[in-house]
A protein has these predicted regions:
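Bacterial Sec-dependent N-terminal signal peptides
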Residues: 1-22
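Conserved, structured core segments of small domains
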Residues: 19-216
Length: 216
């Protein structure tokens, strides 16, 4: 019964699950247990990381990239294949050195698209909210109802904030809600799915080139 409910949860969460994505989203998550190395080596790795970013962008593979305050960041690749993107990532010195916990996910925008920002780049900051599903015995039967309430809540919220993008990752991997401005902790926690523990909201500040989400 639990397996059936989880399957229904995945279907409800991502109605585009069977679609082939146009882009692949990568999280470079902070890695608390990464090896401690000399500052000179860190600089060498990060210089190589930036060089590799520029190369992938010039080749038309990497469409958008940006760091989070506090470390880590994101990539958005022009590809429909997770395996292909994993192969491209092997050229990154930071990935080679295991400096991040890397997640590679299909990307399904519901609001906002993905565009290659034009030079000269204007870096901007956005509030970046990631919703991570937390499936537990005490919330599994409420999932369809809570996820609908979550989507309805974001629709209402969109009327009061400047939404840059909203997207899901398919296969019950959650999604993101990115805004120009700041949503308070109280408002985020008032989301029914967050309040009931079905979704964990991770809030960060993202630096990215203006126009990366096709925003004006």
């Amino acid at each position: 019964m639990k397996s059936l409910l989880f399957f229904l949860f995945m279907l409800f969460w991502q109605t585009t699950i069977a679609q082939i994505p146009d882009h692949i989203f990568v999280f470079l998550n902070n890695k608390p247990d990464k090896a401690k190395i000399a500052e000179e080596e860190v600089k060498k790795i990060m210089d190589g990381h930036m060089t590799n970013i520029n190369r992938l962008a010039k080749e038309g593979k990497l469409i958008a990239a940006g760091p989070f305050d506090g470390g880590g960041g994101i990539f958005i690749f022009k590809s429909s294949s997770i395996d292909q993107v994993r192969e491209w990532l092997t050229t990154d010195p930071g990935v080679q050195a295991n400096r991040w916990n890397v997640e590679v996910l299909p990307y399904y925008p519901q609001h906002g698209l993905v565009c290659a920002a034009q030079e000269p780049y204007q870096m901007v900051t956005y509030q970046f909210i990631r919703y991570v599903p937390y499936v537990a015995k005490d919330n599994i039967t409420q999932q369809p109802e809570l996820l609908k309430k979550h989507q309805d809540y974001l629709k209402v919220l969109s009327g009061s904030v400047s939404v840059i993008t909203q997207a899901t990752f398919g296969d019950a991997e959650g999604g993101i809600f990115v805004v120009n401005g700041e949503i308070t902790k109280e408002v985020i926690e008032n989301d029914p799915a967050v309040g009931q523990g079905l979704l964990v909201a991770e809030v960060k500040k993202l630096w990215i080139a203006k126009g990366a989400f096709c925003e004006k």
